[in-house]
A protein has these predicted regions:
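N-terminal targeting or signal-anchor segments and their processing/structural boundaries
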Residues: 1-371
């Protein structure tokens, strides 16, 4: 607790509280007793440094943005959150003769990256780093012999230019297209090919999709630039085998290289191999909200509702799922953490208290009553 009369936004960073309690076990309920009458600001922290001051880089914080009056018998609920770090880029590192890695902290969205050599702008492509566990992007640059690149990174108020020294390495990234989907295509999914280098052109007239009886299947394709993925959508049939063939020249990459003849085989299962889940949600406070199905901590399925209180997950893999709902206050289709100085709470997450068992060839309907 802090004295409300002298409390400012910077107090939690600089001063220790007037009153403090903590626990070393798993208890989530705290009490403070023998307090002086008055008006207080209440803050909760997961204090990694143990100094009773808030360090947003490592600590979690929860707060109520209005003062409380002591004495009181009221119970106050505070939700802890870890703030997203402000955007900051690391110095790029060379990984091959035509690629740099750029590490960063914070949110990469709306970041602009440009490259130059001397006073000449150098064309580049930005791609997602292959590993989920690393906040980095790939910077692809032309196959030219230069000794350095000036990499400029801007994101809102952040702006910095790095001088990346380049060496003549043995390896250079080249066009390589792999089957990201694997051998089984789920009915909910599209077939996806992933390229090692950025794609600049796709000629659908040189791509053929066939079923097992060699019948040609109509499809549409789109390229997701940041992911370096080609997504194929088509009407799928049960228990069917498919072959997608890329004739020479169907794909051209950033380095003006075209593919050789490529062929990928995959199949679908029967609809009875999957389950369906309908969730009826009561006492919704606001729209939009996100509904996610998780296995352990991994989100497997996700949908957003802007007005409906019943959501459907059709043809999902049989297993036990955790259901959670997120109130998507800023409508960005993902959970957003809080910001202490901006007085923004983290978006509220509500978990269904039990695992939901979805079995093959089952239709499960579950009511979810929110508090």
């Amino acid at each position: 607790l802090y004295d409300a009369q002298t409390f400012t936004d910077s107090t939690v960073f600089k001063e220790t509280p007037l009153y403090i309690t903590n626990t070393l076990d798993s208890l989530k309920v705290f009490s403070l007793e023998n307090l002086k009458e008055g008006s207080y600001k209440i803050v909760a922290m997961k204090d990694k440094a143990g100094n009773n001051k808030y360090n947003p880089a490592i600590d979690k914080i929860g707060f109520i943005d209005y003062p409380i009056t002591v004495p009181t018998s009221d119970m106050f609920e505070l939700e802890l959150f870890q703030e997203k770090k402000p955007f900051k880029a690391d110095k790029p590192t060379q990984e091959s003769n035509n690629k740099l890695f750029l590490g960063y902290e914070g949110d990469f969205r709306n970041t602009k990256v440009t490259a130059s050599y001397g006073n000449t702008e150098v064309p580049i492509k930005i791609g997602k780093f292959p590993s989920k566990d690393k906040d980095s992007v790939q910077i692809f640059y032309p196959n030219v012999k230069i000794d350095s690149l000036q990499i400029s990174v801007t994101n809102k108020d952040y702006s910095k230019t790095f001088n990346a020294k380049l060496k003549d390495l043995k390896e250079a990234d080249s066009l390589d297209i792999e089957n990201k989907t694997g051998g089984i295509l789920a009915f909910r999914d599209a077939f996806v090919l992933k390229s090692k280098t950025p794609i600049t052109a796709i000629d659908e007239s040189k791509i053929v999709l066939r079923s097992k009886d060699s019948t040609t299947v109509k499809f549409t394709s789109k390229y997701i630039d940041f992911e370096q993925e080609i997504v194929f959508d088509f009407e799928k049939k049960e228990d069917e085998k498919y072959t997608i063939e890329l004739l020479p020249g169907a794909i051209k990459d950033f380095y003006e290289k075209a593919n050789d003849s490529l062929k990928y085989n995959f199949s679908t299962k029967q609809l009875s191999d999957y389950g369906n889940l309908k969730i009826n949600i009561s006492n919704i406070k606001r729209f939009p909200f996100i509904v996610e199905l998780l296995d352990k901590n991994e989100v497997l399925y996700k949908t957003t509702s802007n007005k409906e209180t019943s959501v459907y997950f059709e043809t999902i893999e049989p297993r036990q799922y955790t259901i959670r709902i997120i109130y998507d206050y800023n409508s960005d289709n993902e959970w957003t953490t809080g910001n202490y100085l901006a007085k923004k709470q983290a978006e509220e997450i509500i978990y269904f208290p039990k695992l939901i068992d979805v079995r093959a060839n089952w239709d499960v309907e579950q009511d979810f009553i929110l508090d």
